[in-house]
Amino acid sequence: MGSEYAEMARVFKAFCDENRLQILALLRSGEKCACKLLEELQIGQSTLSHHMKILCDSGVVRGRKEGKWVHYSLDPAGTARARQLLEQQLALSSNEVQDMGPCCGGK
């Protein structure tokens, strides 16, 4: 159970930063070289590396080294897993819906 929460935290962390959300938006149109991401985002190399590590560790993004640059793209399996984890967290079972009565003895 603990490892599932660790996975969720790792995946959800990928979505908790404006720069990472911008990177994900850029990658929706296809693979991008790190040089293009640097140009689009107007951030430094070390900042981009930090964000790409978090995105790759989450499984949502994958990198492919070509020469001195890394090319990044969305990982279909990783994005499907992120969607599954989010749906799992937000889903209420029918029992949970029925149990949602007044809180703390209130009416």
Which role does the model predict for each range below?
Residues A6-T47, E66-T79:
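N-terminal helix-turn-helix DNA-binding core of bacterial DNA-binding proteins
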Residues E39, C56-D57:
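Alpha-helical residues within the helix-turn-helix
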Residues H51:
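Residues within the DNA-recognition helix of helix-turn-helix
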